[in-house]
Regions:
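Phosphate-group recognition and catalysis centered on beta-loop-alpha active-site segments
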Residues: 1-307
Length: 307
């Protein structure tokens, strides 16, 4: 697995290519590979019958989920972990409700018919057909220390995910990430050969994502934390292979400190051209974006090496 190359940017399709095609669908990942984008980030939850599935939110999102009669769902509390995989198959996730707040963010996303939430095993089977040396699969395990009964325990989740990873023979192409560092500790203890990336988010005005980085944070497995410049060192001390921060949380100095620790920096989720150029100026190693083709075209236009 090639995480970084000097003077190159690694392009990751975020949830496939969410800006262009329905997120976390097999068609979205096929689209990446057809366009020579060989790295992606995706999300894993667990169904009631303990099948790892590819979806981001703990609950079905009414913004892009239809029932088996073709109607947008209205219930915002349908928990993935409460449904068997057969029950999940009754829902279609191939379109965005463009009237929803979420839908208005991705007005150019194409609609696809009959798109189901995939199993992790299906995505890995698809990925195994990509023979590029640059193939890199970032599996984010969705887990939370804040709310119970949304997932199995971190240990159980890790074992279920790794069962599929080991069947795929893609171990050397996979890096597992999580905001919930308890999950990464389980990977470290049970599967030390698997690379781990540590996700982080520090509160930004106007963004409704929970701050995960603070002293004795449960998201950080209660590790001590006093100031932002020590975060790369903390991650390195945990055996992390990469740091995955929110792109507005970093500075050029933080990237330099991370590189001094031999820790690649892959930022999320960068969709605007000026932010892409800023991240490249900061010398990050990888950029996760909902518009990977946009980033590829920008790199080509600016004579920036990418892989």
């Amino acid at each position: 697995m090639i995480l970084s190359k000097p003077n190159y940017i690694k392009i990751y399709g975020h949830r496939g290519a969410r800006g262009d095609l329905p997120e976390n669908t097999l068609e979205s990942f096929k689209y990446l590979f057809k366009n020579n984008i060989n790295a992606y980030e995706t999300d894993i939850l667990i169904s009631k019958d303990l099948i790892p599935v590819i979806t981001h939110d703990f609950r079905l999102d009414p913004s892009f989920t239809k029932d088996n009669e073709g109607n947008w769902i209205t219930d915002e509390n349908i928990i993935i972990f409460d449904l068997s995989y057969d029950e999940l198959l009754k829902f279609d996730v191939g379109a965005l409700n463009k009237l929803s707040r979420y839908g208005r963010r991705f007005v150019n996303q194409k609609t696809l018919e009959n798109q189901k939430i995939p199993k992790l095993s299906e995505l890995l089977e698809l990925s195994s057909k990509n023979k590029s040396e640059n193939l890199l699969i970032n599996l984010e395990i969705k887990s939370t220390p804040d709310e119970e009964n949304l997932t199995p325990t971190p240990e159980e989740m890790v074992k279920l995910v790794m069962k599929e990873v080991n069947k795929s023979n893609l171990q050397n192409k996979i890096i597992i990430s999580s905001f919930d560092w308890r999950t990464l500790t389980e990977i470290k203890n049970l599967y030390p050969e698997i690379s781990r990336a540590y996700l982080s988010f520090q509160q930004q005005a106007g963004i409704k994502i929970k701050n995960t980085i603070y002293n004795r944070s449960p998201w950080m497995s209660f590790l001590p934390f006093f100031e932002k410049y020590e975060l790369p060192k903390i991650i390195k001390s945990q055996g992390g292979k990469a740091w995955h921060p929110y792109h507005k949380d970093i500075t050029k100095k933080l990237v330099e400190i991370s590189h001094q620790e031999d820790l690649p920096v892959n930022v999320w989720t960068v969709n605007e051209e000026y932010d892409m150029l800023k991240m490249i100026e900061y010398s990050v190693d990888g950029i996760m974006t909902d518009y990977p083709l946009r980033l590829k075209e920008l790199c080509d236009k600016e004579n920036i090496n990418w892989f």
